[in-house]
Amino acid sequence: MGPRSRERRAGAVQNTNDSSALSKRSLAARGYVQDPFAALLVPGAARRAPLIHRGYYVRARAVRHCVRAFLEQIGAPQAALRAQILSLGAGFDSLYFRLKTAGRLARAAVWEVDFPDVARRKAERIGETPELCALTGPFERGEPASALCFESADYCILGLDLRQLQRVEEALGAAGLDAASPTLLLAEAVLTYLEPESAAALIAWAAQRFPNALFVVYEQMRPQDAFGQFMLQHFRQLNSPLHGLERFPDVEAQRRRFLQAGWTACGAVDMNEFYHCFLPAEERRRVENIEPFDEFEEWHLKCAHYFILAASRGDTLSHTLVFPSSEAFPRVNPASPSGVFPASVVSSEGQVPNLKRYGHASVFLSPDVILSAGGFGEQEGRHCRVSQFHLLSRDCDSEWKGSQIGSCGTGVQWDGRLYHTMTRLSESRVLVLGGRLSPVSPALGVLQLHFFKSEDNNTEDLKVTITKAGRKDDSTLCCWRHSTTEVSCQNQEYLFVYGGRSVVEPVLSDWHFLHVGTMAWVRIPVEGEVPEARHSHSACTWQGGALIAGGLGASEEPLNSVLFLRPISCGFLWESVDIQPPITPRYSHTAHVLNGKLLLVGGIWIHSSSFPGVTVINLTTGLSSEYQIDTTYVPWPLMLHNHTSILLPEEQQLLLLGGGGNCFSFGTYFNPHTVTLDLSSLSAGQ
């Protein structure tokens, strides 16, 4: 890489600091953390989305956890030396000011290193802000050619390139850093921006230079799955590519990396584990109630793709003080794959409107016509709640073709709902239940979609009108992320609506029965233990009842239970399905029953370092097995959450429609085309 290319890339990395600083300011402004200094250090303001807030919150709490563990250990009465904090790539972070205000720097000092331009700008900002100068005390500013940009009794800011370690060591020594003193080295999203050889040299240099130290690292991992690929693509487009992820893709590889570089002990956890194990339940509830939130999939994916690591040298700094082992977050890794389901793109769909949306619903209108409605996606060149309906149809040549239609007439129009359910009542009628317009606005009313074909019976000329169903004052369903399943009791057909969430309740445990013939809500006795509340679960019709699998529970942790609402003489009975081996907890998946087997497709899980494929459960024996999805012939990342799926039992295929989400700060991703899964190996293995 030439000098000019290095300079351009360094500039791009510095730009990530500016964006991060604004996110931290927004985080504090919304009350996630107490940090009055973020607004003083960062000019301007930006209101970030709730998902960004949560991501930066867990990052801030993880770093705070490590810093406090270090200071509490070094601050013990027997400690003789002053503690040192060396923040690498510190940017405009306010750590020094927060520690100074909290009285935690009585026997400690802070050094910060960043690119010269960033360091000078921060030093200037501090110097012109009286509130900050009052905390630093008397200070000096370095000469323009000097690495030292700011110096007070317990705070130094240096402008240095971390790739030039000899100069870094000399400048730190001149600024008073004592390598023999207990030292916390902090690198938040820093090492991954360095070329692999530079990052390796920095880790080894720190191990050799500081005999009594703790090295805390926060950065990205898991580049292999669809979210990881999209994350890598985002940073490449910013001209700040992430390095080293292929060689060190997970926490185990990162542990080995530091141990082999000379660190004596190392512990690391991903951010899902940190959030659930190292934050008190009361604090989690506080954060979860700060502002409306409904992007659980991307929140858990973001946390699965970042880790916090603490590597130590010396007897007084043990990594177990930072991340003690916990049984509160057991790892539940799936069994070794029993087979593979090949995936392929529906080829003929590429020349027609694509189904680029998520949070929608899909249903068969007829054996050769699939309707998808609602969700968030692309429409007329912008991202929005989609109002057009998508049809996937095929002729006698068995090639699927897509088309889009809008509602006709001047009556009821599609209201833009998502996370609703759709049930086919006939070839010309579809029932729409629940959904939301936003996390604080449920979609009101039950809708019926009525379809009319043209005189030549051309599916592409299908017309749709929308009517309100049920009573105008019916407020039974103000929920979303629920399920609707066709069940039967005493020769009567019902729709069983279960779970979900609402504006008032973050997770629901209740259910309702809708009589199909009269479109009236009825009460039917249900016996057995009431299941744990959940949303984003799956539900399938089976033997007149409903199979409920997985979901997200009240603690925002995925569930692994499979339940059967079994018909009995007087109504229904809840039963638990015993599964061996137990399945990995998951949610936001889809499910189907094929030849006495329950298929759980895709979804989100947080208790395993792998990513979900298809779990197959034999409903007779209770035995479960795992199948990988081979995406060799899918030329783009395939995200299997917020999607829908349609089973083609005769062809032994599964159609995967839509899916994706708002992927943290990396942008919104939609699966661009419909994908087919070949399930024939499942029948071959019978």
Swiss-Prot record:
Chain positions covered by the region annotation Disordered: 1-21
What segments bear the compositional bias annotation Basic and acidic residues? 1-10
Annotated signal sequence is: none
Provide the species name: Homo sapiens
GO MF term set: tRNA methyltransferase activity
Its quaternary structure?
Interacts with RNF144B/IBRDC2.
Would you kindly state one Gene Ontology biological process term found in this protein's UniProt entry?
A: tRNA methylation
The annotated pathway is: tRNA modification; wybutosine-tRNA(Phe) biosynthesis
Output the lineage of the source organism: Eukaryota, Metazoa, Chordata, Craniata, Vertebrata
UniProt key word Methyltransferase: yes
| Name used for this protein in its record | tRNA wybutosine-synthesizing protein 4
Kindly list the positions annotated as binding S-adenosyl-L-methionine: R59, G89, D114, D161, L162, E188
User: Keywords for this entry?
Assistant: Methyltransferase, S-adenosyl-L-methionine, Transferase, tRNA processing
Superkingdom to which the source organism belongs: Eukaryota
Which family is annotated? Belongs to the methyltransferase superfamily. LCMT family.
Task: Return the InterPro entries for the record.
Answer: Kelch-typ_b-propeller, Ppm1/Ppm2/Tcmp, SAM-dependent_MTases_sf
What GO cellular component entries does it have? cytoplasm
Catalysed conversion reaction: 7-[(3S)-3-amino-3-carboxypropyl]wyosine(37) in tRNA(Phe) + S-adenosyl-L-methionine = 7-[(3S)-(3-amino-3-methoxycarbonyl)propyl]wyosine(37) in tRNA(Phe) + S-adenosyl-L-homocysteine; 7-[(3S)-(3-amino-3-methoxycarbonyl)propyl]wyosine(37) in tRNA(Phe) + S-adenosyl-L-methionine + CO2 = wybutosine(37) in tRNA(Phe) + S-adenosyl-L-homocysteine + 2 H(+)
Tell me the function of this protein. Probable S-adenosyl-L-methionine-dependent methyltransferase that acts as a component of the wybutosine biosynthesis pathway. Wybutosine is a hyper modified guanosine with a tricyclic base found at the 3'-position adjacent to the anticodon of eukaryotic phenylalanine tRNA. May methylate the carboxyl group of leucine residues to form alpha-leucine ester residues.
Cited SUPFAM superfamilies: Kelch motif (SSF117281), S-adenosyl-L-methionine-dependent methyltransferases (SSF53335)
- EC numbers on record: 2.1.1.290, 2.3.1.231
